[in-house]
């Protein structure tokens, strides 16, 4: 019979041996239920399994502003040519506790789209004044401490504030997290846990490569260069941003609820003529998409917070590999879902719009028309599917995809994975190999699982049987997935709303994934009316 540590130490402390029951009872009597009639209360606690402390009597409290006044009277003066430092936990690795997680290291951060590193966020005005470029090393000094960290120019950053992300630069984090990023904790003391005043900034004559996905897979026709707005307010950009992220204010939406249809004309293709008529192959039989289960998705841009939960859930569900910083810098990240960031208006106080983009499963998919081996085809239930062992890696499909959502395996990223890591992979999803194209599949393995379960139970599929990974993980419930032929499904209800629109609808691809336009409910005193220039 073994004994717990408490039972072993009890004879030493109390000079007598006690049972576990007596030890627990004594602790409750002395420390928790220090009341009269303990034996009766003890029996009640054992019977009910819960103990409710008696309510405290109400007390009159007089507020004293001594502490708050002392804080407010603390020296808050910001000297000229000095900066305020803001310490913030990383949106990816928090305070460093998740630094050894490759998924979180490689996920692009909101607004900056940085991966695998932290940086000092500076404003455009400061960057111009100090001649700072993205990735240029700067030295931040505060008191007797100083750190060297690369700079990153962020629209909307206060010109007197430098933001530093915590959680990086750990030396013993693990195989993935050790040595990633820069340790800024030396500047953070017990007296300035959240922010610090009067820091000095010194520009260094050295640079550090930062991996940002901001300019990857952009939907604009022109290659736009971050970080400034100086040359970005072109007619081309201004005309395309409202088409991609359709939005309005609540006040304008109430007056004109059909505003989505006025922004750009959506072309409805003539489905009586099939693209297969012009193919060198025998045309496949036409499918009647008005019958049977037809899968579709709706994404509400008003609800979406660009938190990246959908992208991480997709990576976990579909065995998407981590490729590393260098491959991200080469534009070869493998995420099936990306978050596009758009900035408009005043660079010092821009309006930020975000959009979650994955394969939209076009009914008339441009990718299917150019594949020489038929590796990407359409299913009878409206899903654009990939046959991996048929793919030759020509990448014609990626070139012809207007949404830029297809990802190519330049290497066999999973070949050298240890067996124990392979056991953590989803067995319902195929592992891809070098030379193969991949993309969102609408979590078809979950569709098949739900269909098999319904067949075994001798019933039809009902709305809610299928939860794709992105919709399941979305904390804002911004993603709806289901049968668009079911008028009572959540996705059908969403698509009937007057805010529904198709991304790049003017191309006539009939995407199954559509969006609900973003509605802003801004305080009129805080909103800006000058949101003309635009930048991705």
Language-model segment annotations:
Residues 1, 30-335:
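A cross-kingdom feature strongest in bacterial/archaeal respiratory oxidoreductases
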Residues 3-29:
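Non-catalytic, well-ordered alpha-helical segments in soluble enzyme domains
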Residues 276-306, 338-366, 372-396, 410-468:
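Ferredoxin-like iron-sulfur electron-transfer modules
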Residues 310, 315-320, 359, 372, ...:
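Detector for the c-type heme attachment site
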Residues 310, 376-377, 397, 406, ...:
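Short hydrophobic beta-strand motif reused across regulatory alpha/beta modules
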Residues 313-324, 408-410, 478-489:
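Iron-sulfur (Fe-S) cluster-binding segments and ferredoxin-like electron-carrier domains
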Residues 435-536:
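Long, compositionally biased charged/polar accessory segments in the mid-to-C-terminal portions
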């Amino acid at each position: 019979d073994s004994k717990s540590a408490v039972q072993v130490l009890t004879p030493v402390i109390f000079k007598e041996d006690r049972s576990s029951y007596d030890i627990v009872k004594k602790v409750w009597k002395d420390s928790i239920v220090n009341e009269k009639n303990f034996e009766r209360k003890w029996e009640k606690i054992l019977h009910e399994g819960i103990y409710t402390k008696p309510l405290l009597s109400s007390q009159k409290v007089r507020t004293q502003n001594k502490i708050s006044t002392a804080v407010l009277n603390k020296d808050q003066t910001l000297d000229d040519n000095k900066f305020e430092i803001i310490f913030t936990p990383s949106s990816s690795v928090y305070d460093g506790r998740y630094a050894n997680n490759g998924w979180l290291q490689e996920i692009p951060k909101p607004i900056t789209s940085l991966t695998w590193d932290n940086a000092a966020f500076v404003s455009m005005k400061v960057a111009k004044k100090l001649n700072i470029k993205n990735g240029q090393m700067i030295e931040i000094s505060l008191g007797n401490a100083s750190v060297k960290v690369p700079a990153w120019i962020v629209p909307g950053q206060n010109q007197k504030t430098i933001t530093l992300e915590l959680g990086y630069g750990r030396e013993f984090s693990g195989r993935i997290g050790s040595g990633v990023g820069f340790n800024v904790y030396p500047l953070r003391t017990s007296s300035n846990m959240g922010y610090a005043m009067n820091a000095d900034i010194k520009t260094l004559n050295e640079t550090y490569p930062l991996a940002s996905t901001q300019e990857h897979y952009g939907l604009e026709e022109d290659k736009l260069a971050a970080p400034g707005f100086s040359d970005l307010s072109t007619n081309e950009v201004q005309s395309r941003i409202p088409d991609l992220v359709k939005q309005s204010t609540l006040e304008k939406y109430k007056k004109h609820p059909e505003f989505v249809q006025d922004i750009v004309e959506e072309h409805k293709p003539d489905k009586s003529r099939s693209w297969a008529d012009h193919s060198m192959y025998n045309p496949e039989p036409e499918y009647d998409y008005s019958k049977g289960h037809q899968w579709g998705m709706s994404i509400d841009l008003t609800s979406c917070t660009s938190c990246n939960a959908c992208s991480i859930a997709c990576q976990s569900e579909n065995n998407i590999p981590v490729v590393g910083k260098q491959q991200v810098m080469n534009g070869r990240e493998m995420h099936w879902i990306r978050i596009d960031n758009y900035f408009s208006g005043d660079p010092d106080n821009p309006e930020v719009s975000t959009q979650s983009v994955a394969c939209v499963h076009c009914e008339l998919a441009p990718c299917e028309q150019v594949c020489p081996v038929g590796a990407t085809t359409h299913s009878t239930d409206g899903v654009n599917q990939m046959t991996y062992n048929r793919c030759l890696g020509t990448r014609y499909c990626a070139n012809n995809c207007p949404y830029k959502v297809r990802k190519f395996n330049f290497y066999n990223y999973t070949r050298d994975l240890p067996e124990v890591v392979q056991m953590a992979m989803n067995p319902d999803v195929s592992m891809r190999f070098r030379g193969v194209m991949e993309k969102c599949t609408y979590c078809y393995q979950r569709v098949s699982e739900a269909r098999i379960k319904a067949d075994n139970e001798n019933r039809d599929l009902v709305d809610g049987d299928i939860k794709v990974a992105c919709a399941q993980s979305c904390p804002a419930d911004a993603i709806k997935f289901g049968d668009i032929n079911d008028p009572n499904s959540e996705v059908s209800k969403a698509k009937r709303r007057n805010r529904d629109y198709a991304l790049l609808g003017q191309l006539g691809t009939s995407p199954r994934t559509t969006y609900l336009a973003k509605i802003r409910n801004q305080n009129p005193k805080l909103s800006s009316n000058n949101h003309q220039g635009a930048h991705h």
